[in-house]
Amino acid sequence: MTRMQQRTLMVMAGGTGGHVFPGLAVAHLMQAWGWRVVWLGNPNGMEATLVPKHGIPMEYVQFGGLRGKGMKTKLMLPVNLLRACMQSLSVLRRVKPDVVLGMGGYITFPAGMMTALSGTPLVLHEQNSIAGLANKVLAKLAKRVLVAFPKALPHAEWTGNPIREELARTTAPRQRYAARSGPLNVLVVGGSLGASALNEVVPRALAKLAPHERPRIVHQAGAKHIDALRANYEAAGIAAGDGAQLVPFIDDMTSAYANADLVICRSGAMTVAEIAAVGVAAFFVPFPYAVDDHQTTNAAFLADNGAALLVQQRDLSADALADWLRSQTRASLAEMAERSRSLAKPDATEQVAQICATVAGVTPSLSPEGKQQ
């Protein structure tokens, strides 16, 4: 694609990694196809720091949500929404995108509305199993509506969640599990913010298992929670390093997933997508305060198909977890992992990118020069 022919994709996403990282996956592929990519986000969101590190220029719109905000913010909503709409229109006129991809976040609503009203094609992607109000409204204006989970929005196309390419290239579960012996390998993921329920219950559950029954543990807790996690393991009589690796962060999550027989974690949309892509058994404990309880329905997509276990936080106990771990074998977990892999959408990134290109009236370039290296 020559410079004169170069098309422009504008990605609008922000607020959380669940919106930003899928957008980045699509953005990088479109760049590899020769597209110019511009990102629209909030100057106060994580995207303002993260996206420029990926070599993608930023445009900004100031707009936020109302949850947990005071009366003054709520009264100012009409003014703030109008301002965000005008800012969005200004960006659209300046960037002149051929297609806009909405990946979620508060700024998606005013920017998506102005995209549709200006006549620019809008492609909408919903990452969670339950769509928010903004996407329910924008879905009526978008040229194509894509979802990560079936039935999240009516008349939408099920593409799955765009993920990092290396996750989909992981060796098949059957081969990975068959090559292992000895204690089970369990990965506990609390995320960057940690998950206090997991940090408290998992060590106590392990303490209830006889030494020969205990799995090898890698437990990630977040920097702010790592000291408390170490104290929890010590209180349970399990020394760090004695079959338990306690870490604040994991840089290579692909390898961490691939080396695990079981992952104990929350069930954010990207976590569920990544676990399915790799193909690993999961024990999901949904975050109980997620909007619309979407983490429960995210987890249910795998759990209802025998690919994971879903336990609500209120029902999580050391005794119950210990009993369940005692009942599992590597073979039983391998079966769950294979079911999980069968539900994955490994081509989601390419499918979303192709839809964006098609909506813009372009046949995606899949020549050697256009492919990602």
UniProtKB/Swiss-Prot annotation:
Cross-referenced InterPro entries: GlcNAc_MurG, Glyco_trans_28_C, GlycoTrans_28_N
Keywords of the record: Cell cycle, Cell division, Cell inner membrane, Cell membrane, Cell shape, Cell wall biogenesis/degradation, Glycosyltransferase, Membrane, Peptidoglycan synthesis, Transferase
This enzyme's EC code(s): 2.4.1.227
Domain of life the protein comes from: Bacteria
Cellular component GO terms held in the UniProt record: plasma membrane
Pathway in which this enzyme or protein is active: Cell wall biogenesis; peptidoglycan biosynthesis
Disulfide bond sites: none
Membrane topology: Peripheral membrane protein
Catalytic reaction annotation: di-trans,octa-cis-undecaprenyl diphospho-N-acetyl-alpha-D-muramoyl-L-alanyl-D-glutamyl-meso-2,6-diaminopimeloyl-D-alanyl-D-alanine + UDP-N-acetyl-alpha-D-glucosamine = di-trans,octa-cis-undecaprenyl diphospho-[N-acetyl-alpha-D-glucosaminyl-(1->4)]-N-acetyl-alpha-D-muramoyl-L-alanyl-D-glutamyl-meso-2,6-diaminopimeloyl-D-alanyl-D-alanine + UDP + H(+)
Residues binding UDP-N-acetyl-alpha-D-glucosamine, per UniProt: 16-18, 128, 164, 192, 250, 295
Keyword Electron transport in annotation: no
Subcellular location: Cell inner membrane
Keyword Cytoplasm (UniProt): no
An example Gene Ontology molecular-function term: undecaprenyldiphospho-muramoylpentapeptide beta-N-acetylglucosaminyltransferase activity
GO BP term (any one): cell wall organization
Pfam family, one: Glyco_tran_28_C
Database matches in PANTHER family: GLYCOSYLTRANSFERASE (PTHR21015:SF22), UDP-N-ACETYLGLUCOSAMINE--N-ACETYLMURAMYL-(PENTAPEPTIDE) PYROPHOSPHORYL-UNDECAPRENOL N-ACETYLGLUCOSAMINE TRANSFERASE 1 (PTHR21015)
Function: Cell wall formation. Catalyzes the transfer of a GlcNAc subunit on undecaprenyl-pyrophosphoryl-MurNAc-pentapeptide (lipid intermediate I) to form undecaprenyl-pyrophosphoryl-MurNAc-(pentapeptide)GlcNAc (lipid intermediate II).
Xref: HAMAP family: MurG
Family note: Belongs to the glycosyltransferase 28 family. MurG subfamily.
Protein name per Swiss-Prot or TrEMBL: UDP-N-acetylglucosamine--N-acetylmuramyl-(pentapeptide) pyrophosphoryl-undecaprenol N-acetylglucosamine transferase
Originating species: Paraburkholderia phymatum (strain DSM 17167 / CIP 108236 / LMG 21445 / STM815) (Burkholderia phymatum)
